[in-house]
Amino acid sequence: MKKLVFILVLLIYCSLATAQEQGDFRVQIAGDYKLQINDLGGNAGFEYFFADRFSFAPSFTYWFPDIGRSYSLNADLRYYLTEGISQVYLVGGYNNFWLNLQPGEPGQVLSRAGANFGVGAFLDLMDQFGVVTEFKLQSQNTRQPVLRVGVVFKL
């Protein structure tokens, strides 16, 4: 867990150091909801625009299950179909899900890797602030649909 947080902070730092133009880098705070099993999670991530209409968007979600502990790491590629105030995009990437039904017990963590794909929209409300919604399917286990709603800060 500490390694994941360290890697995420390092990636954010590296992206801040290289993004020079306004709008090239965004930070996101969101809530995730698994539609089939009614599971809520808190999400944090960033987005870096490396080419016209393309961005790399890693994020980390900590889920709040009824029993145990679970979290997931996403590394997504986004392609923006529209520009302007309402920006619609396609998303696809890698997801790894970790589940521990007995926290504190060594060797009890279940790890599932898979792909995800979906669609999202970014609504540009102000110069440095916006709202994001995203719907995607994750391929692990039962092809879990996830809905994300959050706020985005442009740096």
PLM ranges: what are they?
Residues 1-23:
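Cleavable N-terminal export/targeting peptides
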Residues 30-42, 63-71, 110-112, 136-147:
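Solvent-exposed loop/turn segments connecting transmembrane beta-strands
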Residues 24-29, 58-73, 98-115, 155:
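Flexible, solvent-exposed loop segments that connect beta-strands
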Residues 33, 48, 79-81, 96, ...:
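Residue-level signature of outer-membrane beta-barrel architecture
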Residues 27-31, 44, 58, 75, ...:
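Membrane-embedded beta-strand positions of outer-membrane beta-barrel proteins
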Residues 25, 53-58, 85-88, 123-131:
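Repeated loop/turn-to-beta-strand initiation elements of outer-membrane beta-barrel proteins
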Residues 19-65, 154:
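Short glycine/proline- and aromatic-enriched beta-strand/turn motifs that initiate or cap beta-hairpins
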